[in-house]
Amino acid sequence: MKEVILIKNGELALKGLNRRTFEDMLMANIRRRLASLGKFTCTPAQSTIIVEGPEDADLDEATERLLKVFGIAGLSRAAAVEKDMDVILNTCVEYTAPLLNAASTFKVEAKRADKKFPLNSPAICREVGGKILSKFHHLKVDVHNPDVIINVEVRDKCAFIHGNQLKGAGGMPSGSAGKAALLVSGGIDSPVAGWMMAKRGVELIAIHFASPPYTLSLIHI
């Protein structure tokens, strides 16, 4: 089992032939944001980006940093395992145990991108749900408003298992919409405007005029 971070890139999936250009910008921003934590790799796959770090990587800190990167709609810490149902079942119990121990209700969601996998999505949900109920007797199933959602994604090369998805900053990757200058005053309006522009992919150059003692002399007059 290898632990990775799954990035959901949101509205980038709506882009056409230039979608890969936006994904490349987002992956470059991710690598730059995590550079001080070690060498991380980014791999685009089926509307997601798989972020892998070195064995001793601090994934808690990496997750906190990525939540502030524009272009990321959501992310999850996930266990990457081989596409074997027994391995998937055991990993679901072991990897998500901290979440399940603290919860009262749960739900299983499965996505089977690899159609050659012997079980379909509803069957995967039944198998995983049954395994969890056999190990965590205090839990109940709630498909409408669960405390924890256990996700199983069967991809082409491996399967990913993760809990609730964390909401990211959203928007577009920084630098994808050119550059602009932001006049930063002493009020709240300019920082808010800057944040909204940055969320749409604008790379900002902040400008601030510090003019004392001239402004102070005008006030005294």
Task: Cite the ranges covered by each PLM segment.
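RNA-binding accessory domains that recognize and position tRNA/RNA substrates
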Residues: M1-A181, P191-S217
